Amino acid sequence: MKMYARLGLLTAIGVLLFTACASAPITTESTPAGAPRPSARQSQATPRPAVTPLTPIESLGRTGTPIDVDIEAYRLVLDGLVDRPLAISYDELLYYPAVSQVPRLECPGFFVDYAEWKGPLVRTLLEEAGVQAGAQEVQFCDGGALPYCRTLTLDEALLDDTYLAHTVNGQILPPEHGYPIRLVAGSKLGSYWVKWLFHIEVK
């Protein structure tokens, strides 16, 4: 019995570690009765405290192993329930209108960072591709042999703080932080910020 109890404890610890950056929004406060609710393009992310300095790139928390990328051959594919599938090169992505924000990057129990991430809104690409009626969610996957994917609702993907970062703190993304492109989802925990982004699928 002691052996089974020990195995149960180890399993529980493993689950906690795996779900440390689980799928829950940072802000947990409910909207008071009668208060206006945010629109589809307004985020409920926790704002950056005014006195908190930017986290240096070398101090940013990170997980995962960088993926080797042939930047000349790289294409960010956007397909699924769209009228015009896209295959966008890295250089083309750099020419898209970009936003620059300082969202809260949190992996509960491990790190909370504030850095300035810059890149085009996901909404811009979705509008270019033409989202079809009936689409409900958007999946983001890296380019690994066994791709790591996270899914946002379509409304979350259209938020003003959901974008594709190619720059952090004024510098090109380092490989360990998602070069060439990393999803920034300001209303979500760090597990949703997919690094080494290769594929966006509208479902």
Positions of predicted regions on the chain:
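Bacterial lipoprotein signal-peptidase II cleavage site
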Residues: 22-30
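Structured, non-membrane catalytic/scaffold regions adjacent to prosthetic-group chemistry
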Residues: 26, 34, 38-203
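Bacterial N-terminal signal peptides that target proteins for export
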Residues: 1-8
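C-terminal motif of bacterial Sec signal peptides marking the signal peptidase cleavage site
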Residues: 17-20
